[in-house]
Regions:
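Long, low-complexity, polar and repeat-rich extracellular regions
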Residues: 1-148
Length: 148
């Protein structure tokens, strides 16, 4: 990229409201951008006045590498649900406030998301796995066995 243009695959502007993006299983949203800002480099960049929703069961990838941004969320009230066998290949940046990141990869599943930025967000694992905020990760519980 030239450094002055945006090469986002999907981008909403800061005055957008009530946006919904769904990437179904098998879907692959990608770009190849290592620009120096999240706004310019993120594969998917969602900015919302008060409500935005992204549900990902497919793949969101920045082909410039995992150290570049695949997902950026900004402004206010964006809810991101990362679920099933969906993948985010690249970093996630959070700016603004009042966001929620929900994880639903299945009970006992291991995952890791590199999340940075100065924004505020709540983190939930909808399957009850323990989750760590910052860089979101869960340690797979493997085969659990109950003995009476």
């Amino acid at each position: 990229s030239s450094g002055t243009t945006s090469n986002n695959a999907i981008r909403s502007e800061s005055d957008t409201d009530n946006i919904t993006i769904i990437n179904n299983s098998g879907g692959h949203i990608h770009n190849n951008n290592s620009a120096n800002t999240v706004l310019r480099s993120a594969t998917v960049y969602i900015s919302s006045v008060s409500t935005g929703t992204l549900t990902n069961s497919g793949t969101i990838e920045n082909k410039a590498g995992v150290d570049n941004y695949a997902l950026g969320i900004a402004e206010s009230g964006v809810t991101v649900t990362l679920k099933d066998k969906g993948k985010v290949i690249g970093k996630i940046n959070v700016a603004g406030s009042g966001h929620t990141i929900k994880l639903q990869h299945g009970a006992g599943q291991a995952y890791f998301y590199d999340i940075d930025g100065a924004g505020t967000y709540d983190l939930e694992d909808l399957d009850g796995n323990p989750v760590v905020k910052g860089s979101a990760g869960s340690i797979g519980q493997g085969a659990n066995e109950m003995i009476d």
